[in-house]
Amino acid sequence: MSKRITRVLFKISGESLSTDSGNRIDEVRLSRLVAELRAVRNCDIETALVIGGGNIIRGLAQQKELQINRVSADQMGMLATLINGMAVADALKADDIPCLLTSTLSCPQLADLYTPQKSAEALSQGKVLICTTGAGSPYLTTDTGAALRACELKADLLLKATMHVDGVYDKDPREFSDAVKYNRISYKEVLSRGLGIMDASAISLCMDSHIPIRVFSFVKHSLEQAIFDEHIGTLICEDA
C-alpha cells in the first residue's frame, strides 16, 4: 500500500479479551490491548476500535438455547459489546490514554451517543475512539458495524484481528489441511467465491468506499505490525 496511513479502524472480537479458563475479560489480555493501542497512537495514527461481544454472549448461538427471538438476541449481543468497550475505556484511562467511548444505542450514563462528526473530532484530537453496539440494528453483525464506521470516519485501512486464522483462505484451514492462503485478494473475488471471513455487506461497503481490509492473526501479530508489515495476513483491496 503506497498511501500513507493516518487513520485506522481495528475490528477485534470479544473473544480476544477472554481466556479458555472462563475469564470473560482477562486482565492480561486487556493490558495487552491497551499497550498495543498506545503503540499505534504513538506512531501518530488516529485509532478507532470496534469490539465484539462474543466473550459475554453469542446472540445467534444462544438464541435457541435461551428461547428468545432474533431481535432480542442481537440486542443482547450489542449490550455485550458495550460492556467490553467500558472495560477497554477504563483501562485506557488508567494508563493515561485519552479516549472516547461511544454507543449507537442511547445510554448517556454509560457512553456518548455515536455520531460521525463527534467521533472524527475525537480522533483528530488524538483520542482512541471506541465504538460499541455494532451497527445499532439487529440482523447486522459487528463486522458490518466496523465497515460502516470505517466508511463514515474515512479510515485509510480497516484491520480485522482474528483469533483462529491468520488471513483469508480458499477454504477453512481448520477443517482442510490443503487450504491455500491469499496474500492479497480483491473485494469482488471474496464476494464471488463466498469466502466467509467477513459479511458480504461489510466487504461491499469497504469496496464502495475504497477502504482496504487487512485480515490478520491477533494471536501471532500486534496491531502495529498489521498496519506496517504488508507480509502479514491478507489484504483485501480493489486489485489482487
UniProtKB/Swiss-Prot annotation:
UMP binds at residues 53, 74, 135-142. Disulfide bonds: none annotated. ATP binds at residues 11-14, 54, 58, 162, 169, 172. GO terms for biological process: 'de novo' CTP biosynthetic process; UDP biosynthetic process. Homohexamer. Belongs to the UMP kinase family. This is Uridylate kinase. It comes from Chlamydia felis (strain Fe/C-56).
